[in-house]
Amino acid sequence: MTDPRRRTGRHFLTPENLSSTLQITNLPPEWNQDIITSVVAGSGPVIDIKAKNDPRTGKLTGVLFDYLTSKDCKRAWEILNRIENFPVKIEQIIPPNYKDHLRETANKNSQKQVLQLNRDSYPFEAGLELPFEMVTEVPIPRRPPPPQAANNTNSVSNNTNIQFPDILSKASKHLPSFQDGSIIAPDKISQNLSKIPPLQLIEIISNLKILSNQENIQKSQLESFLDTNSDITISVTQALLEMGFIDYSVVTKVLKSQVGEAPSLLSSNNTSNSNTPVSVIRNNTPLHVPSNEVSNNPNNMPLNVAMPMPMSTPPFIPLPLQQQPFGFAPPGPFMPPAQGPSMGQPVLANQLGQVQQQNISSTEGPSNANKANDSGTINMAKLQLLPENQQDMIKQVLTLTPAQIQSLPSDQQLMVENFRKEYII
């Protein structure tokens, strides 16, 4: 038995002297060995790197960095723990081949070479902050451009070379005519699109694709193209809602942006109509209506009281959202007048106010409140869901004669037409 007093190895074979390897675990799932090496570079002389994988899945679970000496390993452990936002676990361990490592360390003529590490795979998106001595040893390279931007550039260059065949871009000329019953409309989007002839729909979609693929396209040009057909605009919005690209809050925000000055306009109209219903009206665009038609329709008298309300009062818009299968309002809110909600509606109120001035002596009510001047009957069940003042206003709008509607500007005719589509059955 060896005399314990002669066993001197216990004085230098300590865990502190044998721990020459750093084990880095708890790696982010998207990190690999190259990324970890790019971060550890500059922490000290590394002579070997080994990956530690899960034996069942083969997934990387850790990386082992073997340093030249245990002192280098301890210094590297202290430096790496000073890295901010470093989402890993760092441990000092004794390598399995510690005897060979000690033998090579003691041999001054050892051929073990120190690895030259770099930061080619440095994770810029992780937001790490390296200590100064690590950056001095191995500088951080300039951040490369994001790959997404490069992909977008390639896609734009590729899209510029796309050429649609004339059979699609000019479908109405080349494809055969549509046969009734060959296309069905099982859902709301298809029902809206079925209002457009199929050849014209193919042509619209092709032109929209061509327009969107242009490199210098502007948002206003796409908006102008979509404004040419309200059914296309509504169908696109419904499709975006179903696919999850937008939600109801986006639709509500867009509708509210179209009625920006509604509260002030509504309060001013209510105040002026309650105090001086006729004298305070100002009109710079006269409305030319034949006197005989005006006198025959006394229902025009109170139109100036609440005409701006349906397009400017927010409570009027969410009601169709509860009734439509996809939560969309009728075409009116999606096709704002060309003059904007802050100009077109006061003009309409003023012009209808002149009709009131011409018929201020008429006080008789309509002969049939549920019957519109044009063909059709007012949908009273739907109309009763609105406040009482809005019910009266919409009834009066629906009783306008075709001649009076034709005398209005085109944008105001569109407003009246939207009411008729919504409340006449």
Swiss-Prot record:
GO terms for biological process: mRNA 3'-end processing; mRNA processing; sno(s)RNA 3'-end processing; termination of RNA polymerase II transcription, exosome-dependent; termination of RNA polymerase II transcription, poly(A)-coupled. One of its GO terms (molecular function) is mRNA binding. It holds the Pfam family CSTF2_hinge. The modification Phosphoserine is found at residue 272. InterPro entries: CSTF2_hinge, CSTF_C, CSTF_C_sf, Nucleotide-bd_a/b_plait_sf, RBD_domain_sf, RRM_dom. It comes from the Eukaryota. It is found in: Nucleus. Keywords: mRNA processing, Nucleus, Phosphoprotein. GO terms for cellular component: cytosol; mRNA cleavage and polyadenylation specificity factor complex; nucleus. Its main location: nucleus. Transmembrane segments: none annotated. Component of the cleavage and polyadenylation factor (CPF) complex, which is composed of PTI1, SYC1, SSU72, GLC7, MPE1, REF2, PFS2, PTA1, YSH1/BRR5, SWD2, CFT2/YDH1, YTH1, CFT1/YHH1, FIP1 and PAP1. Component of the APT complex, which is a subcomplex of CPF, and is composed of PTI1, SYC1, SSU72, GLC7, REF2, PTA1 and SWD2. Present with 937 molecules/cell in log phase SD medium. Component of the cleavage and polyadenylation factor (CPF) complex, which plays a key role in polyadenylation-dependent pre-mRNA 3'-end formation and cooperates with cleavage factors including the CFIA complex and NAB4/CFIB. Component of the APT complex, which may be involved in polyadenylation-independent transcript 3'-end formation. PTI1 is required for 3'-end formation of snoRNAs. This is Protein PTI1. It comes from Saccharomyces cerevisiae (strain ATCC 204508 / S288c) (Baker's yeast).
